[in-house]
């Protein structure tokens, strides 16, 4: 095998004619055993190498090469002690191997290096390849599998963090849209898309939320992953939505960006309040009961449905008659507001002199609870 290395059989042949053959053979075996724990075991002034050093490197994690032999790491081992104590016997099972092999380094030529760089540019998330072409094809990704680490995802593909659309699936039957929106936080919504079961009850099945800005969507996603976000006692699982890059979606994205850049307070909610047109009450009729003004909710809803589907109309506690109108889309509220301010229009002639209309705060425009 190696130079100056003698096995037990060779020792027997070398000292065949000696009278102390048994003693020398035993001495050779003892030296072979204790050489595992000695760093400088020698025979005739030469250091033993080969299998013994490899075994010591395996046990004690010492480096003897650059190609995989240093990939073993001892846990709870003491190199300076030759024998293990009783309390260390259980530690023998803690030896573990970090990797199968670290491998050796080999230089790569220019052509293969270009191929490597091209492969790195492809997006990987959690060890799985995600095709770039599927990002804007309307695919829904769960938060746990696609955007777990924002810093990692942002460094590889910033488009993943730019989405502001979140889907809530498997909503319990009998749950209304108002109950879902009352638990949503993070910021104002640009629009809402509702999916219902094809049954006579028309129960709610799925809701797509489009936030007005990206930060609000990210904040709500982190909040929805906690146990705090529950709808009627059921924790819903949010998922990201990536839209198709169609002309309609691009135009909506540009309109939302203009709203954010102008820094105007715009929401999908309109506050409609009765103006004070009656005279101040006299002392003679102070004791009389205050008369309530009549309002036709169906007529009000019909007038504003011309600009978009109305989600709900709710009363507001006020000294004067006041209601809030929530649309499914923020563009519907913007069209209604423009119609109200335009002279000669239908809303202007009917509501401008007797009603005051302005943008109200969205019910979802609340900060999320930071944990």
UniProtKB/Swiss-Prot annotation:
<dbReference type="GO" id="GO:0005619">
    <property type="term" value="C:ascospore wall"/>
</dbReference>
<dbReference type="GO" id="GO:0030295">
    <property type="term" value="F:protein kinase activator activity"/>
</dbReference>
<dbReference type="InterPro" id="IPR012677">
    <property type="entry name" value="Nucleotide-bd_a/b_plait_sf"/>
</dbReference>
<protein>
    <recommendedName>
        <fullName>Sporulation-specific protein 2</fullName>
    </recommendedName>
</protein>
<comment type="function">
    <text>Essential for sporulation and seems to have a role at the time of, or after, initiation of nuclear division. Appears to have a role in outer spore wall formation.</text>
</comment>
<dbReference type="GO" id="GO:0005634">
    <property type="term" value="C:nucleus"/>
</dbReference>
<dbReference type="GO" id="GO:0030476">
    <property type="term" value="P:ascospore wall assembly"/>
</dbReference>
<dbReference type="InterPro" id="IPR035979">
    <property type="entry name" value="RBD_domain_sf"/>
</dbReference>
<keyword id="KW-0749">Sporulation</keyword>
<dbReference type="GO" id="GO:0030437">
    <property type="term" value="P:ascospore formation"/>
</dbReference>
<dbReference type="GO" id="GO:0003676">
    <property type="term" value="F:nucleic acid binding"/>
</dbReference>
<dbReference type="GO" id="GO:0005628">
    <property type="term" value="C:prospore membrane"/>
</dbReference>
């Amino acid at each position: 095998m190696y130079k100056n290395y003698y096995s037990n059989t060779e020792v027997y042949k070398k000292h065949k004619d000696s009278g102390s053959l048994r003693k020398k053979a035993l001495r050779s075996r003892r030296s072979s055993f204790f050489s595992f724990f000695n760093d400088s075991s020698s025979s005739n002034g030469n250091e033993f190498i080969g299998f013994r050093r490899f075994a010591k490197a395996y046990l004690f994690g010492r480096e003897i090469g650059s190609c995989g032999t240093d990939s073993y790491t001892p846990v709870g081992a003491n190199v300076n002690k030759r024998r293990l104590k009783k309390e260390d016997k259980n530690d023998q099972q803690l030896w573990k191997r970090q990797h199968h092999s670290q491998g050796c380094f080999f230089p790569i030529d220019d052509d293969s290096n270009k191929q490597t760089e091209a492969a790195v540019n492809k997006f990987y998330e959690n060890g799985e390849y995600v095709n770039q072409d599927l990002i804007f094809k309307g695919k829904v990704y769960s938060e746990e599998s696609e955007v777990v680490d924002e810093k990692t995802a942002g460094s590889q593909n910033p488009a993943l963090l730019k989405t502001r659309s979140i889907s809530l699936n498997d909503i319990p039957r009998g749950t209304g849209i108002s109950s879902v929106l009352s638990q949503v936080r993070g910021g104002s919504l640009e629009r809402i898309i509702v999916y219902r079961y094809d049954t006579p009850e028309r129960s709610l099945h799925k809701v797509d939320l489009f936030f007005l800005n990206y930060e609000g969507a990210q904040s709500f996603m982190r909040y929805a992953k906690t146990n705090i976000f529950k709808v009627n006692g059921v924790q819903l699982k949010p998922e990201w939505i990536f839209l198709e890059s169609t002309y309609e979606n691009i135009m909506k994205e540009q309109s939302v960006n203009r709203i954010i850049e102008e820094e105007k307070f715009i929401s999908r909610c309109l506050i409609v309040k009765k103006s004070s047109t009656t005279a101040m009450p006299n002392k003679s009729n102070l004791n009389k009961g205050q008369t309530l003004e009549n309002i036709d909710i169906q007529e009000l809803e019909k007038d504003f449905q011309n600009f978009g589907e109305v989600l709900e109309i709710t009363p507001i506690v006020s000294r004067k008659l006041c209601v809030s109108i929530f649309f499914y889309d923020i563009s519907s509220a913007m069209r209604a507001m423009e119609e109200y301010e335009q002279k000669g229009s239908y809303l202007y002639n009917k509501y401008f002199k007797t009603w005051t209309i302005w943008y109200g705060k969205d019910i979802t425009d609340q900060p999320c609870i930071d944990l």
